[in-house]
Amino acid sequence: MAVPKKRHSKRICKIKFYSWKSKFLKKVQFIINQKSIIKNK
């Protein structure tokens, strides 16, 4: 019983990590866009 539980928690960690990563990348993209807009003005 303990082994599948571990595997499942690993999968949850992976999903959490990827959702955090995508949020972070979106934030970075937003900052880059803001900077480029400021440069263009």
From Swiss-Prot:
Tree of life domain: Eukaryota
Subcellular location: Plastid
Coiled-coil regions, chain positions: none
GO cellular component: plastid; ribonucleoprotein complex; ribosome
Keywords: Plastid, Ribonucleoprotein, Ribosomal protein
Chief localization: plastid
Family according to the record: Belongs to the bacterial ribosomal protein bL32 family.
Name under which the protein is recorded: Large ribosomal subunit protein bL32c
Organism of derivation: Helicosporidium sp. subsp. Simulium jonesii
Gene assigned in the entry: rpl32
